[in-house]
Design a protein with these regions (language model features):
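N-terminal Rossmann-like NAD(P)+-binding domain of SDR-like oxidoreductases, especially those catalyzing
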Residues: 1-151
Length: 151
């Protein structure tokens, strides 16, 4: 099995992915999370596993990211500010995490030839009449002058 990087690995989805990869026999997993919206309690059950390395830090604060990632095979980039309320209350931090940190991860992974899986939010779909979405579903995306649509 491969060696994985999971940014945002202490969040709900990230921590679930960490546990699934461990169950499938991952050789090692590097979790990078600043715990701004994730929680150490989500990964507490795996922190003593010798295959886990946890770095409690903002991605943009890691100076040696290129060399840190160099021995890994695949990156799941899940780190992001989540929730409209959180984004509105932490605009600068959200921009740093959602844009600059993503850029830094992509550059480091490119420098090390590491494939990356990028994730997004359901917010990109806007609003639709039905709860079930298909590729043909018509959606409404509002103006960015309204806080609800600005992130």
């Amino acid at each position: 099995m491969k060696k994985f990087i999971i940014t945002g690995g202490a969040g709900f989805i990230g921590s679930t992915l960490v546990k699934a990869l461990l169950e499938k026999g991952a050789e090692s997993i590097l979790i990078i999370d600043d715990l701004s919206t994730g929680s150490e309690s989500n990964i507490s059950s795996v922190l003593n596993d010798e295959r886990i390395e946890f770095i409690n830090s903002r991605i943009e604060d890691i100076d040696n990211l290129d060399s840190l990632l160099s021995s890994y095979d695949f990156c799941y980039h899940l780190a992001a500010g989540v929730g409209v309320q959180y984004i509105m209350e932490n605009l600068s931090d959200s921009l740093l995490t959602n844009i600059l940190a993503t850029h830094k991860v992509l550059e480091s992974c490119q420098a090390n030839n590491i494939p990356v899986l990028l994730t997004s939010t359901s917010e990109v779909y806007g609003v639709a009449e039905d709860d079930i979405w298909t590729e043909d579903t018509k959606s409404l995306i509002g103006p960015t002058t309204k806080l609800r649509w600005s992130y």
